[in-house]
């Protein structure tokens, strides 16, 4: 057998959480729908439709913290994975009803971050709801390094990112409940360690473009769409647009694999992602 020379993405927070969850499983996880057979460890797609060479990473000041329902990291259609591909400062934790990961609690208390729990405001007490980001200065806060296993301060970033967060300002940390809607509501109600966080309620006139799972409402967004809206609110325009384009490319590869069709590397989704790529980033090949 010829060696596998395809470029594989390095493991990120969601990938590591998936590996840990698989290690605890007593039997293999069988995904419903989607392509069957061998999957690439870097993108969860079948090897013929691998996405790893197209993975874009955009330096940001904002961070994302995913709190994931039990089997969510195992689902090939999960889009939290895409967020971790694009935003280096993405952390991921499994949710349990009875306890919270100490590293998660340390991250939420870290003075470099201003955390926001992203959730629809209609289900939250009005005094907790915000619709814009809070201007916070960390100069008056106690100083501390990043917690063990947490997110380190971001280095340089592409000037097109547009994040308006200076060295003295707290960096926004968007806490997303990555789950089905019924699960997310349960997680919101039964996570008292999140009760002190401001709740960021997003307002968007857009309709979800996510096509890999069904939803009864067009205004229910998948996790990566929510993250893109958050990044846009933080002024991280390049990261927001890149994540949107990357979701479209992932959807194209996923559905083409499901229907046993070749990838069209020259379609509008791939060309948009190509146009947004950072200097020196991966070049999209129409010959995939």
Language-model region placement:
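C-terminal folded domains that constitute the principal catalytic or ligand-binding module
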Residues: 173-174, 181-288
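Short hydrophobic beta-strand segments
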Residues: 63-70, 114-119
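Short Cys/His-rich Zn2+-coordinating modules
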Residues: 16-33
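Short metal-coordination and nucleic-acid-contact micro-motifs, chiefly zinc-binding Cys/His arrays
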Residues: 36, 46, 60
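Short cysteine-rich clusters marking metal-coordination/redox-active sites
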Residues: 40-43
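S-adenosyl-L-methionine/SAH cofactor-binding core of RNA-modifying enzymes
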Residues: 88-185, 189
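Short cysteine/histidine-rich zinc-coordinating motifs and their immediately flanking basic loops
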Residues: 51-66
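Histidine-anchored nucleotide/phosphate-binding helix
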Residues: 74-86
